[in-house]
From Swiss-Prot:
Glycans are attached at residues 77, 121, 130, 134, 146, 150, 180, 189, 224, 228, 233, 254, 276, 282, 288, 318, 328, 340-341, 371, 377, 381, 384, 415, 435, 582, 588, 597, 609. A motif (Di-leucine internalization motif) lies at residues 835-836. Residues 545-563 are annotated as: Immunosuppression. GO terms for cellular component: host cell endosome membrane; host cell plasma membrane; membrane; viral envelope; virion membrane. This is Envelope glycoprotein gp160. One of its GO terms (biological process) is virion attachment to host cell.
Length: 836
């Protein structure tokens, strides 16, 4: 009764045990997971080292060649967050461009010797004719100062007087109360000025920012993307598009365009406007500056302006008529963002640096400062006509790269002109809500790079992932480590990013091979580029960056492999562990939901906070397994006693036996020598070579007696008394051999007795096994007969029941059939009876 009452509880326990289905932590290598990262990027360009064009020089020293086959992989079902205002790529590009400018100025001459007193007069140049046209009649005069000053010659104690033309913005009067014509250069009390080398050019060339191996660049392909928020159209690339590092304020020149519409990116008081169409701007400096050279010291040459041929007023820029429509569209967009009461105005020219109050850019080596009031003032009618911007030219320029650093741009001979495209604006706004004032701005060059890099961000590939699995690590045996082969391209590793975890885990081996092969491929490309330009990369900031990028990926890969090795997962794409999975790590998400609905990226975000805990538990479990394996291996040595009788170990046993016998013989020889020496020292001589000396009988536990007359004699034995050294040695060797013979005989008897006992035990064991076999066979035969009889009885009973049922069914069918057949007869009989 008690057994029957316990059955329900037992069944319930079994059902609970089966239904619990515990999960274990499983390690996956090669999962498509990435995280936001900051790393050292390097640049690539299409510059040619053999080209004689000056603007290729710095690109060949700075960048590696571009990839002729750039790869871009579209990530389906992936949503990624971008924030252009916190994008470290823009800050890194800022530092890199600064380094490039400073590097290009390193060998150039410092102009400290020019910080002297100058006597200056106004100079309007030598007019070569009336070249003023109607379109330039309202341009500003470009006033010049003709200054003379004393400089030190190549011989230090001698001086000479020279003269040079300076723009009025580059000199300031010295107010010492003596003479109103004394001037100095504007930089002398604030800025260290370097003269640009004669061959230095600031013409930009497109550069591509590239991620090192082990990293990737995410790209947002959505139109009208604000640069801050989620993007659903995401792809991964290795390098950005070609970015021209054009330095300018107020207007963005030669940048990228949006594919759909005008986009305004707003952050704080900054407004970055990106157009979808370009507006051309053509700038000109007519006339001919005649340049001269003045030696200001040993190997130091100052390139000055000797005279100007032509009209000094003709420095200007022409903005095409498309400006009006694009500016009107931009204003509507800004009013929609800030409010309808927003007003627009140009920069105040009364205060501030020229770089902020004017449009500053470099045109063919000269620095232009253009008045943009005609572009931004609402009073100006800008519809369907070309706008002329008056420009100034400065030779002493405050560099945007560092505070208190400047550059002297040597004069450029001949006519200067350059054509650019306006692709956006840099604006600021101020005022209270509803009454905003928008005006052009500049000076913070990082905004230029943000405008180009808004759709990019750098991520690091994290190929190691953990997830719950139903399998548990069972054994501690060593497995052969698998080696990964080389596969496809690196970016294909993220191709399964939008797939669910179950679908992506099927291709883990391919993804792991892709990861390694991509690293190897990128390392080879980078090494080839560096080897091709190693003579140019010396002492270059970019050379250091490229070498760092070269080492970084291998370090990351080795780190991942070391982690897998510590977990006992080296060389495996799927590795099972003995760590139970805690449902709280995954917020109690069901197993089927994890593997069928989540991508690896979504799963990583869910368990990221617990990754450290899980990794520690896996490492502890592996350490415990190593301890268990060591103990098992030590125990396994005692479990293999039969290996002691392996034929390969017999020589070792024979060697040990020979050493033991040699040791015993050596000890006996030493004992014999000591005995001989003792006898010789006693000084006796035996009477004969052999004398019979009776010995007393000894009991089993009595010491041997040698004197006569002590007790009775059982038997006599002869003791050999010899003389001579060789005879004594022979006697001792004979006794030793007899001793060894007796010991070996005893050992053989013991071994024979042991073998007899083992044989008897083995025979007895075989008899027991035979009896057990007979009993088992009898039991099997008995139960087989019983099962056979039961089966026969069951078949007989079934046959009888079926036969009886069949007979009854047949009889019933016959009765029904006869009844149906008798119906006409019964009808006829009824009719006959009715008629009678």
């Amino acid at each position: 009764m008690g057994m029957q009452s316990g059955w329900p509880f037992f069944c319930l326990l079994i059902s609970l045990t089966i239904g619990s289905d515990p999960h274990w932590v499983t390690v996956y290598y090669g999962v498509p997971v990435w995280r936001d990262a900051e790393t050292v990027l390097f640049c690539a360009s299409d510059a040619k080292a053999h080209s004689t064009e000056a603007h290729n020089i710095w690109a060949t020293q700075a960048c590696v060649p571009t990839d002729p086959n750039p790869q871009e992989v579209l990530l389906t079902n992936v949503t990624e967050y971008f924030n252009m205002w916190e994008n470290k790529m823009a800050e890194q590009m800022q530092e890199d461009i600064i380094s490039l400018w400073e590097q290009s100025l390193k060998p150039c001459v410092k102009l400290t010797p020019l910080c002297v007193t100058m006597l200056c007069n106004n100079s309007n140049g030598n007019s070569a004719g009336n070249s003023t046209t109607n379109r330039t009649e309202d341009l500003e005069d470009r006033q010049m100062k003709n200054c003379s000053f004393n400089i030190t010659t190549e011989i230090r104690d001698r001086k000479k007087q020279v003269y040079s033309l300076f723009y009025v913005e580059d000199v300031v009067p010295i107010k010492d109360g003596t003479d109103n014509n004394t001037y100095r250069l504007i930089n002398c009390n604030t800025t260290a000025v370097t003269q640009a080398c004669p061959k230095t050019t600031f013409e930009p060339i497109p550069i591509h920012y590239c991620a090192p191996p082990g990293f990737a660049i995410m790209k947002c392909n959505e139109g009208n993307f604000s640069g801050n928020g989620s993007c659903t159209n995401v792809s991964t690339v290795q390098c950005t598009h070609g970015i021209k590092p054009v330095i300018s304020t107020q207007l963005i020149l030669n940048g990228s365009l949006d594919t759909d519409d005008i986009v305004i990116r707003h952050h704080g008081g900054n407004l970055l406007v990106q157009w979808n169409e370009t507006v051309s701007i053509n700038c000109t400096r007519p006339g001919n500056n005649t340049g001269g050279q003045v030696q200001i010291g040993p190997a130091m040459t100052f390139y000055n302006i000797e005279k100007i041929v032509g009209d000094v007023r003709q420095a200007y820029c022409n903005v095409s008529e498309e400006w009006g429509s694009m500016w009107n569209k931009t204003k509507k967009k800004i009013k929609r963002l800030l409010g309808n009461n927003t007003t627009f105005k140009a920069q105040d020219k009364n205060g501030g640096d020229l770089e902020v109050t004017h449009l500053m850019f470099n045109c063919x080596g000269e620095f232009f400062y253009c008045n943009t009031s005609r572009l931004f003032n609402e009073s100006e009618n800008k519809t369907n006509k070309t706008i002329i911007l008056p420009c100034r030219i400065k030779q002493i320029v405050b560099l945007w790269t560092r505070v208190x650093k400047g550059i002297y741009a040597p004069p450029i001979r001949g006519n200067l002109s350059c054509x650019s495209s306006i692709t956006g604006l840099i604006l600021e706004h101020s005022g209270e809500n509803g009454n905003k004032t928008v005006y052009p701005s500049g000076g913070n060059m990082v905004n230029l790079w943000r405008q180009e890099l808004y759709k990019y961000k750098v991520v690091s590939i994290e190929p190691i992932g953990v997830a719950p699995g139903k399998a548990k690590r069972r054994t501690v045996s060593r497995e052969k480590r698998a080696a990964f082969g080389l596969g496809a391209l690196f970016l294909g590793f993220l191709g399964a990013a939008g797939s669910t975890m179950g679908a992506a885990s099927i291709t883990l081996t391919v993804q792991a091979r892709t990861l390694l092969s991509g690293i190897v491929q990128q390392q080879n490309n980078l090494l080839r580029a560096i080897e091709a330009q190693q003579h140019l990369l010396q002492l270059s900031i970019w050379g250091i960056k490229q070498l760092r990028a070269k080492v970084l990926a291998i370090e990351r890969y080795l780190r991942d492999q070391q982690i897998l090795s510590l977990w006992g997962c080296s060389g495996k794409t799927i590795c099972y562990t003995t760590v139970p999975w805690n449902d709280t790590w995954s917020s109690n998400t069901s197993y089927d939901t994890i593997w069928x609905n989540l991508t690896w990226q979504q799963w990583d975000r869910k368990v990221r906070n617990y990754s450290g805990v899980i990794f520690d538990l896996i490492e502890q479990a592996q350490e415990q397994q190593n301890t268990n394996e060591k103990a098992l291996l030590e125990l396994d040595q005692w479990a293999s006693l039969w290996n002691w009788f392996d034929i390969t170990k017999w020589l070792w046993y024979i060697k040990i036996a020979i050493m033991v016998v040699a040791g015993i013989i050596g000890i006996r020889i030493i004992s014999a020598i000591i005995t001989i020496i003792a006898r010789v020292r006693q000084g006796y001589s035996p009477l004969s070579l052999q004398t019979l000396i009776p010995t007393a009988a000894r009991g089993p536990d009595r010491p041997e007696e040698t004197e006569e007359g002590v007790g009775g004699q059982d038997r006599g034995r002869s003791v050999r008394l010899v003389s001579g050294f060789l005879a004594l040695i022979w006697e001792d060797l004979r006794n030793l051999l007899i001793f060894l013979y007796h010991r070996l005989a005893d050992s053989l008897l013991i071994i024979r007795r042991t073998l007899e006992i083992l044989g008897q035990s083995l025979s007895r064991g075989l008899q027991l096994l035979n009896e057990l076999r007979i009993r088992l066979w009898g039991i099997i035969a008995y139960w087989g007969k019983e099962l056979k009889d039961s089966a026969i009885s069951l078949l007989n009973t079934t046959a009888i029941v079926v036969a009886e049922g069949t007979d009854r069914f047949i009889e019933l069918a016959q009765r029904i059939g006869r009844g149906i057949l008798h119906i006409p007869r019964r009808i006829r009989q009824g009719l006959e009876r009715a008629l009678l």
